């Protein structure tokens, strides 16, 4: 197996070719925050919290999907990186339900933890805030899109089970993860099964 030599915050580490920056950082013992990442399930870089600086890249890159190259120098905690993460958190909170005290994840919330670490509150961006009614349309799921941060973890896990009942719908500020229609489900399951038959993951 071909190994690549990189540095993460000055720490030298060797990782297999094809490894991501996130994997290299973890091998070096460096923590990079993530909200959407789930190894081998949801590696899409949707949340943008894992951005880092890397030599050879034109701007900040998402560590969970960006592959390392030989000799790459990665910086995970520069002022530029911290500012980008803070802005991303502020944007997430701009449309987020801030009733943390009544939330079952309060004090065990990845978003809450990162907001405290980066000094983020809910007032950086004001404007239109979509609101959603609780979705009790199935006996198996209760959806509260007011708390959804669009990480798409639920979508990835659902698709892995070839259920495809949940998906990202609409666009822009109206994007939400919600139940697919029967037609959307059939189309998505057909696509997933076709890709599996062809060996595409």
Predicted segment positions?
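N-terminal cofactor/phosphate-binding cores enriched in small/glycine residues
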Residues: 4, 11-70, 79-80
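Extended, non-catalytic structural segments that build the interaction scaffolds
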Residues: 9-11, 143-144
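Fe-S ferredoxin-like electron-transfer domains
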Residues: 48-52, 57-193
């Amino acid at each position: 197996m071909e190994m690549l030599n990189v540095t993460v915050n000055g720490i030298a580490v060797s990782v297999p070719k094809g490894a991501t920056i996130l994997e290299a950082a973890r091998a070096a013992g460096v923590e990079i925050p993530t909200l959407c990442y789930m190894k081998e399930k949801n590696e899409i870089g949707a949340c943008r919290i894992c951005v880092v600086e890397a030599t050879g890249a034109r701007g900040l890159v998402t560590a969970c999907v960006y592959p390392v190259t030989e000799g790459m120098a990665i910086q995970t905690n520069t002022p530029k990186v911290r500012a980008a993460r803070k802005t991303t958190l502020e944007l997430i909170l701009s449309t987020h339900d801030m009733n943390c005290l009544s939330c079952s994840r309060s004090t065990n919330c990845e978003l809450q933890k990162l907001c405290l670490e980066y000094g983020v509150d809910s007032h950086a961006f004001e404007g239109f805030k979509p609101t959603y009614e609780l979705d009790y349309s199935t006996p198996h799921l209760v959806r509260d899109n007011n708390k959804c941060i669009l990480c798409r973890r639920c979508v990835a896990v659902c698709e892995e089970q070839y259920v495809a009942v949940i998906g990202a719908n609409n666009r822009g500020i109206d994007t939400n993860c919600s139940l697919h229609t029967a037609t959307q489900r059939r189309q998505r399951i057909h696509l997933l099964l076709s890709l599996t038959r062809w060996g595409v993951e």
